[in-house]
Swiss-Prot record:
<dbReference type="InterPro" id="IPR016187">
    <property type="entry name" value="CTDL_fold"/>
</dbReference>
<keyword id="KW-0325">Glycoprotein</keyword>
<protein>
    <recommendedName>
        <fullName>30 kDa spicule matrix protein</fullName>
    </recommendedName>
</protein>
<dbReference type="InterPro" id="IPR051004">
    <property type="entry name" value="DC-SIGN_domain-containing"/>
</dbReference>
<dbReference type="GO" id="GO:0009897">
    <property type="term" value="C:external side of plasma membrane"/>
</dbReference>
<dbReference type="Pfam" id="PF00059">
    <property type="entry name" value="Lectin_C"/>
</dbReference>
<dbReference type="GO" id="GO:0006955">
    <property type="term" value="P:immune response"/>
</dbReference>
<dbReference type="GO" id="GO:0030246">
    <property type="term" value="F:carbohydrate binding"/>
</dbReference>
<feature type="signal peptide">
    <location>
        <begin position="1"/>
        <end position="15"/>
    </location>
</feature>
<comment type="function">
    <text>Matrix protein of the sea urchin embryo spicule. The function of the matrix proteins is to direct crystal growth in certain orientations and inhibit growth in others.</text>
</comment>
<dbReference type="InterPro" id="IPR001304">
    <property type="entry name" value="C-type_lectin-like"/>
</dbReference>
<keyword id="KW-0732">Signal</keyword>
<feature type="domain" description="C-type lectin">
    <location>
        <begin position="92"/>
        <end position="162"/>
    </location>
</feature>
<dbReference type="GO" id="GO:0038187">
    <property type="term" value="F:pattern recognition receptor activity"/>
</dbReference>
<dbReference type="InterPro" id="IPR016186">
    <property type="entry name" value="C-type_lectin-like/link_sf"/>
</dbReference>
<feature type="glycosylation site" description="N-linked (GlcNAc...) asparagine">
    <location>
        <position position="102"/>
    </location>
</feature>
Length: 290
């Protein structure tokens, strides 16, 4: 019995020691997982307008972040990624405030700003990555920005804006496989998609306005809030087979060597969260297309 008590005391002491090594130990833990990260200290010698790791565009500074916290379990252990899937939306907004005192999840005020974020972030992606923006369902049943700025511009994927149901937030860079002439084309859309803000973890874009700068006002326009469609040049008619989806890549490997899918490539398909069963959201899916 004494041996059991001794082991239990040692385990508790080790757990307490390990907890003390975490960055921000003793502080609140973000809902998306990972330890609290302290605010960024301003560098008085820095001559750039934006803080380190941030990029300036217009009157704003932006930070694209995976939301993957680095965590050291103990002083003698290496630093590991604690939350590789990103953060819940509210936790992502808290994280932005820790990266800079005046920052929040990005507020998108115009089509030009939306297009900049799209081109800037997608160029850094190896694979499509859904990203939280600051629009979320407020307590009054209306869409609102975490920055507190008025909602003067939206860019929803569907023509009819979604209802601001409790618990919803907006993400950008949704992706899905599309039928194209060439194999395995993946479309990353600059339109916004409603997501469960407390159930889905994503990367994030933060924004703040440097001292003396304010948010650029959206120019009044009656044009649609999505990029115009471009017309592809005429192409010869061709027969295109269907996309084949499976949640186990081994079931698809044999299809790559012959038949209609011969010569195709196998890709993991980004998981669009809405209107999909829970088992689809939790497990990766794979697809091939001739």
């Amino acid at each position: 019995m004494r041996g059991f008590v001794y082991v239990l005391v040692c385990v508790l002491a080790l757990a307490s020691f390990s907890r003390a090594q975490l960055p921000g130990a003793g502080g609140p833990v973000l809902p998306g997982g990972g330890p609290t990260i302290g605010p960024v200290n301003p560098d008085p010698t820095r001559t750039e307008v934006c803080a380190k790791f941030w990029v300036q565009e217009g009157n704003s500074c932006y930070l694209f972040d995976s939301g993957a916290f680095l965590r050291q379990v103990a002083a003698s252990r290496p630093v590991v990624v604690n939350n590789q899937d990103g953060l819940f939306q509210a936790a992502a907004n808290m994280y932005c405030g820790q990266m800079h005192p005046n920052a929040s999840l990005v507020t998108v005020n115009s089509l030009e700003e939306n297009n900049f974020l799209y081109e800037w972030a997608v160029r850094m992606m190896i694979e499509p990555e859904p990203v939280w923006i600051g629009l979320h369902a407020g307590p009054t049943g209306q869409w609102q920005w975490y920055s507190g700025e008025p909602v003067t511009y939206t860019n929803w994927e569907r023509m009819t804006p979604p209802i601001a149901e409790p618990g919803l937030g907006a993400m950008i860079f949704d992706a899905d496989i599309i039928a194209q002439m060439f194999n395995n084309q993946v479309e990353i859309t600059p339109q916004w998609v409603p997501e469960q803000a407390i159930n889905d973890r994503h990367a994030l874009i933060c924004e703040y306005h440097p001292s003396g700068m304010t948010a650029a006002a959206a120019a009044p326009t009656n044009a649609p809030t999505f990029p115009p469609m471009t017309t592809a040049p005429p192409m010869a008619a061709t027969t295109r087979g269907p996309v084949m989806f499976q949640n186990n890549p081994r079931n698809l490997v044999n299809s790559l060597t012959g038949g209609r899918f011969g010569g195709s490539l196998l890709h993991e398909i980004p998981r669009r969260q809405r209107m999909r069963p829970s088992n689809y959201r939790k497990n990766p899916y794979f697809g091939i297309q001739p």
